[in-house]
Amino acid sequence: MMQIQNILRAGHVPRWQLCDTTRTQSIAEHMFNVALIARHMCAHIGINGDEMNEIVVQALTHDMDEVILGDMPTVTKQRLREAGIEPNGLIDCVETIITDPFAKQLVKIADLIEAAWWIDEHGIGRHAERVAEITRHRLFSMLNNAKVDKALTSAGMDAWERIKHGELLI
């Protein structure tokens, strides 16, 4: 289990270290945004009560490993996976490891929506544009994947469209 001091550091651990941005985003801000998107997706699908709360908590803690390890670029995570290492499991510090496949997909879609939106809004320069393009491609590839539940595809597309048009998700 992670110590409270490390959890509280999440607000000071930066993301997007390899991209120029108009401002710094912390791991805590990212996880909070992902939780709001996940909550919206749950409501869109009709998930509520304890199940929604569990998914929101999972979204609030999904990148807690990065408080210790720092933000890892996707390419690094891919290379670790190729080596048989799950990057989000490098530090077994969070009790809310996502085991339910549906919840895992929902949080991943919310994570990609948040990342694509944030780098679109705050990225500067050609590299940030490329990262935004890659992130959007990953998002839409996942949403169009036949293995992804159609309710998740619908909820993800709704959340993406609302965010792009500046609508509140709450």
From Swiss-Prot:
Co(2+) 2 binds at E66, D71. The keyword Protein transport does not apply. It catalyses: dATP + H2O = 2'-deoxyadenosine + triphosphate + H(+); dADP + H2O = 2'-deoxyadenosine + diphosphate; dAMP + H2O = 2'-deoxyadenosine + phosphate. Uses a typical 2 metal-ion mechanism to dephosphorylate dATP. Co(2+) 1 binds at H30, H62, D63, D111. This is dATP triphosphohydrolase. Pfam families: YfbR-like. GO terms for molecular function: hydrolase activity; metal ion binding; nucleotide binding. DATP binds at R15. Its cofactor is Co(2+). Belongs to the Caudovirales dATP triphosphohydrolase family. Catalyzes the hydrolysis of dATP, dADP and dAMP into dA. This step is essential for Z-genome synthesis (containing aminoadenine instead of adenine). Specifically removes dATP and its precursor dADP from the nucleotide pool of the host, preventing the incorporation of A into the phage genome and favoring the integration of the Z-base into the viral genome. Keywords: Cobalt, Hydrolase, Metal-binding, Nucleotide-binding. It comes from the Viruses.
